[in-house]
């Protein structure tokens, strides 16, 4: 029995945990920022990083793509654990081949789902079966919410070991001023994804963190431009008011429908800055907001203004 225990301890010592993280996107990319956040936590726990570059992999042959991945997983040992953050925002073929490579090494795979592209964009919905197949090949899947899990089960997901993230953490390493109550709403996001910003005519000003060059000049908006995390936290806490988590569906982007299933990084950003929340009444975190007294959920933007 002694040699069995020693052999098992030796296997545990040799086993390593790896975590993927994407590179090559804009520093403003929430996809890049959120993967880096998870990766940094993993590094603190002793995980080894596998960097994955974001690029046009359609220009590569299968062999070239395979060679690239061999370099990414060069430090992988048989039986190691890999936390695979998805999507990589490369092609579905890329993610599938990467999973093939991991399984060929006998890796145990924890797939950490940040977003599901086929559920975000109507034109990509046809890829959902392939994405679910990748989840089914994983040993463990971390999903944003139970609502998303329920939906995926209806579409064929069978993985038995599933964890729910529910809410993003947002570590802050600086001292922030205590926000004061102000009759303002703050919002951050791309105007192409959230066009309601351009139609803002309410009597309460909207403080907008994003590209203000395309804003309607008649809108009641104070555009402050894009800010990095530290600047954003300081600005939000200094100006006070409420953080607005709002989305609406349109032809190609089903933002509102998707918000019922995903975990909003924006919500956690506002909370980390000390701002209460005003959000769509059907946002996935509505119960979390209500149970902890973190703000209000409303059905219309007019109601959001009234709550302020």
Which residues does each PLM region occupy?
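Extended catalytic core of nucleotide-activated donor transferases of GT-like folds
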Residues: 59-150
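Donor nucleotide-sugar binding/catalytic pocket of nucleotide-sugar-dependent glycosyltransferases
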Residues: 139-153, 157-174
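Nucleotide-sugar-dependent
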Residues: 228-273, 279-287
């Amino acid at each position: 029995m002694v040699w069995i225990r020693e052999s098992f301890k030796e296997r545990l010592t040799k086993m390593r945990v790896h975590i993927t993280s994407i590179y090559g996107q804009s520093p403003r990319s929430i996809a890049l920022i959120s993967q880096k956040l998870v990766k940094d936590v993993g590094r603190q726990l002793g995980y080894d990083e596998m960097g994955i570059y974001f690029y046009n992999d359609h220009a590569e042959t299968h062999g070239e793509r395979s060679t690239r991945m061999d370099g990414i997983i060069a430090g992988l040992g048989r039986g190691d654990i890999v936390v695979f953050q998805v999507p990589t925002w490369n092609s579905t073929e890329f993610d599938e081949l990467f999973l093939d490579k991991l399984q060929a090494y006998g890796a145990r795979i924890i797939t950490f789902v940040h977003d599901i592209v086929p559920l975000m964009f109507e034109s990509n919905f046809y890829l959902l079966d392939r994405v679910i197949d990748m989840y089914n090949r994983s040993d463990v899947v971390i999903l944003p919410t139970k609502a998303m899990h329920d939906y995926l089960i209806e579409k064929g997901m069978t993985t038995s070991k599933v964890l729910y993230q529910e809410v993003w953490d947002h570590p802050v390493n600086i001292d922030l001023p205590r926000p004061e109550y102000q009759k303002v709403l703050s919002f951050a996001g791309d105007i192409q994804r959230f066009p309601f910003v351009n139609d803002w005519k309410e009597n309460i000003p909207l403080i907008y963190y994003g590209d203000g060059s395309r804003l309607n000049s008649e809108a009641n908006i104070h555009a402050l431009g894009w800010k990095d995390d530290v600047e954003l936290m300081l600005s939000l806490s200094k100006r006070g008011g409420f953080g607005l988590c709002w989305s609406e569906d349109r032809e190609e982007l089903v933002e509102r429908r998707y918000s019922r299933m995903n975990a909003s990084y924006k919500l956690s950003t506002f909370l980390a800055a000390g701002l209460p929340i005003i959000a769509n009444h059907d946002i996935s975190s509505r119960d979390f907001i209500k149970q902890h007294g973190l703000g209000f959920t409303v059905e219309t933007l007019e109601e959001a203004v009234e709550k302020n």
